[in-house]
């Protein structure tokens, strides 16, 4: 019986640690995105996204499909650092869906000379080749 209890506790601890490690990786990636954005570096900001035609970004104008289309939309909407401003994410929750997918809910805020803006977002992350990537982004 002791062996069974020890085994169960070990599995619970290992599973919990794996989730925490993955959550920390996701939070770290979002922090890197903030840093890149705040330097005016959209290409490095985009490294958090899945570089694939199946990426979906949903904003006020509806869905945009594909990494390059999403990149071009960011570059068009934020042509320089005065429009980009300073980005801050406030993470509300980071929840595992399974071993390879996480669902993140948060708020975003841009402090800018041309006027502050902000809203909420939901992100679907997938572990691809050992790295967590955003495969779906719904920002409002």
Model regions and ranges:
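Surface-exposed, charged secondary-structure patches
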Residues: 71-114
């Amino acid at each position: 019986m002791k062996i069974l209890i020890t085994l169960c506790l070990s599995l619970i601890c290992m599973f919990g640690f794996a989730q925490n490690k993955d959550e920390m990786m996701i939070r770290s990636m979002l922090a890197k995105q903030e840093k890149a954005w705040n330097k005016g570096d959209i290409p490095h900001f985009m490294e958090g996204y899945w570089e694939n035609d199946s990426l979906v970004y949903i904003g006020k104008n509806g869905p945009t499909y594909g990494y390059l289309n999403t990149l071009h939309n960011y570059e068009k909407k934020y042509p320089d650092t005065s429009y980009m401003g300073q980005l801050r994410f406030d993470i509300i929750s980071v929840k595992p869906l399974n071993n390879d997918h996480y669902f993140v809910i948060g708020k975003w805020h841009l402090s800018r000379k041309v006027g502050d803006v902000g809203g909420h977002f939901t992100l679907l992350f997938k572990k691809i080749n050992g790295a967590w990537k955003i495969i779906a982004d719904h920002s409002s």
